[in-house]
Amino acid sequence: MKITDIKLTGVSFGALDKPFWNSIVRTTTSGGGRVEIHTDEGVVGMAPSGASAVRRAHILGAIKTKLVGEDPLRIGHLWERMYMGGTRKPVAKGEYITSMSAVDNALWDLKGKALGQPVWKLAGGVRNRVTAYAAGGYYEEGKGIPEMCEELSGYAASGFR
């Protein structure tokens, strides 16, 4: 089996009522996407992905070039091909590694379909407990230090460490 194509479809939900940002990027719109990995045997792996212009360029550019023609079941090998020699540095960083994550998830979906196995089984089984984390602390217009402290204290009060 060989990878023949990688596609990325996206959808935009428009502008956010309340944009937010972290130390790196400001988020003003909402949307999402799906990466699809197609093979010569008709098996297609899919996974959710953002569909920003940067992510689109990474997935349909450098990553696609490295994976088309390869065996999709060799996920470790393909991960190394994607990781080494990202777009501008010796190793992957930032949006590039986020793009890799979507492709990696689609490869696992493809492998599960090809082998007739659920991905959880391919990944080694199940666990009775999973450590969760709270993502927050984003900046917003009108949100100051007191509001940030209140938000983060709420996560701690809910049991997040």
Residue ranges and their predicted role:
Residues 5, 38-114:
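Metal- or metallocofactor-binding catalytic centers and their adjacent structured scaffolds
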Residues 41, 115-141:
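N-terminal small/glycine-rich loop or linker at the start of catalytic domains
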Residues 129-161:
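Metal-dependent enolase-superfamily TIM-barrel catalytic cores that perform enediolate-based chemistry
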Residues 20-23, 119, 150:
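Glycine-rich, charged/polar anion/phosphate-binding loops
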Residues 1, 101, 158:
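Structured loop/turn residues at beta-strand edges in well-structured enzyme cores
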Residues 98, 105, 117-119, 128, ...:
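Conserved structural scaffold segments of CAZyme catalytic domains across common CAZy folds
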Residues 26-29, 123-126, 156-157:
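Solvent-exposed alpha-helices and their adjacent loops that cap or buttress functional pockets
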Residues 1-46:
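Structured beta-strand/loop patches that form or line metal/cofactor-binding pockets in enzymes
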